[in-house]
Amino acid sequence: MNKITFMGVELEEQGPSDLIVKALGKSIKLMDLETFIDTTGFEKDPIMNDYFWQIMVTKQRTHLSAMLLQCLGYEGEFRVQQQHFKRFLKSNNIHPLELTSSDPDIKNYPTIQDEMKLLKPNVISNRKWLIVEPREFKKVIMKLNTKHGDRIREYYLCLEELLRLYLEYCVYFKEREAKLQITTLEQKLEQMNITMIEMKEEMNLSMEEHADKLDTLVDQNEELKLDVSEANEKLETVTHKLGIAVEDRSPRLEQKPLRERFVLFKRNVKNARFQYYAIRGQSIYVNGRLTLYNERYPNLEIIIDIFCQPNPRNLFLRFKNYVKDDERFNFAGNNVECDITYESIMKEIFEKLNEEKRNV
């Protein structure tokens, strides 16, 4: 089985233990050791915690007070305790520091100051207090042969297991944090892609709306022209004199790109309200618009394509006027809303209106 190893801690491939899972579920932030102890239910020993835990985690020297010597298993009067302990230190080649009442370092040890309050001046002047380095005190614990020695060493073994468990928790926490950062980054990238797509769609829609507004303005202009034309027709009564051919009434331009043209195409876009769109103008303009819309709507289908239409804008306006009361058709600029079942009817109407150009 493959294992992940970090600082001597092996993480099983199947994942963290139930205890680690519990700790990970406690907080999204990395817990300190004290909170981890409370969360995992590690059994605390008040005496052990007060003396031995602090010695293990701090770098401060330790004052071997009467209370501490009792915890180590030394009994009797303090003088006797201290003598026995000094012999123990000497036999194990451990050299403590001895402070007197005149030593300025005494102020760094509250337990010494507390003892001095209970002693007579003559006793204080002759008293010596034993101080040991943290590393030396740990040696004391490992070699201690009093009745409390095994209990103290057992506590240290438990602390070692606790620290290993906490280290394992930290590794899994960092692993989870890294995965969350990757997931968050992926989500941000996905959101950026979605935003870019939405912006592109909005831009396309905006361009189409502007084109529709332009076409609407052109339609309004054409309607004004129609009004003027109708007024002129009332003044002119020469229609009966026109005996010319249709081609003479609407002669073709020699340049094909400049000939007028009318196109109605179907977008073939799913769920689109307006499937049909009209383009009116010179052939060169119509071709340019068709190229643009073919890129936008790959399934575009031309329904009506009339070349040499003398007035394509007029044709579309007459179609709108023809079906204005017909609920089967709706308009928005050059857009036409029509159910596909009525497509053939719409084509027939356009063809009928186009043929009216031949009526004198």
Curated annotation (Swiss-Prot):
Keyword Coiled coil on entry: yes
Entry keyword annotation includes Phosphoprotein: no
Highest taxon of source: Viruses
Coiled-coil spans in chain: 173-243
InterPro entries (UniProt xref): DUF3627, MSV199_dom
Membrane-spanning intervals of the chain: none
Keywords per UniProt: Coiled coil
Name of the protein in its database record: Putative MSV199 domain-containing protein 212L
